[in-house]
Amino acid sequence: MIEQNVDGICILANYSEQFLLSDEERETLTRLCIEHVDGRVPVITTVSHFSTDIALSRAKLVKSLGGDMLMMMPPYHGALMKGSPQQTFEQFAKVGEAGVTIMVQDAPLSGVDLPVPLLVKMAKEIEMVKCFKIECAQAAAKLRQLVNEGREIIEGPFDGEEGITLFADLEAGATGNMSSAMLPDLIRPVVLDFLDGKVEEAESKYNQILPLINYENRQCGFRAAKIIMKEGGVIKSDYCRHPIAPLEDSTREGLIKLASKYNPVALTWGL
């Protein structure tokens, strides 16, 4: 990923299949990734858990290893156990005691509503809460409201969800994007051009790669990056642990065929 020219790397997130890893595997990967990157780019480590104590212990491990940032979803477990706004605030405040910058992940997977006033309150009152990855429905509207109401305390408004809403989110005030590992080398120029005021160039570049982003987001999910990395010799296997099913053959072939038109780094890196 460093040779994809990324500005940072996020580990143990939902697209990292964190929900299929044991506690021991999580700790091993946290150590391995932070040590292997060795300061070349910042590493963001996801520490989400319904238990505040467990999330805090994960944060302390990251701190001890020299990790640069944490990412957290609000506390949830299954479809019905969800932290209240106050409980969510308290969990982020407690994890903030570890002394590592926090990115709040507002993702639909949690099913927890994070209204903008709560996010602004967290940014104002919890020292370590500085960044926000917004990938809920109508993300652009929420980003715009967050930036307008939070102003300078919202240090890092990020787009997510593989960049499927990237251009609208940039127009709304996002200053960064967290994509999958499949094509960050193709997404980065869009963001940089936009932030440099080259809006038409950014829009053109985004429109060119949007079919591949759409195919990943709507047809494949997190399996896309693994398939492309295996095809490109980056990894040996694209196996997904049960109960995740393998991608249907025709969809897999369609992904590889489409990706070959764009030639992302991941498709050739290990060949």
Residue map of PLM features:
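Secondary-structure boundary motif
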Residues: 3, 35-39, 64, 97, ...
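Conserved, mostly hydrophobic/aromatic
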Residues: 1, 33, 62, 95, ...
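Active-site beta->alpha loop and helix N-cap motifs at the rims of alpha/beta catalytic domains
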Residues: 2-111, 268-270
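Flexible glycine/acidic-rich beta-alpha junction loops that bind and position SAM and/or redox cofactors
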Residues: 80-81, 142, 227
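C-terminal alpha-helical cap/extension of soluble enzyme domains
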Residues: 4-6, 171-174, 182, 186-271
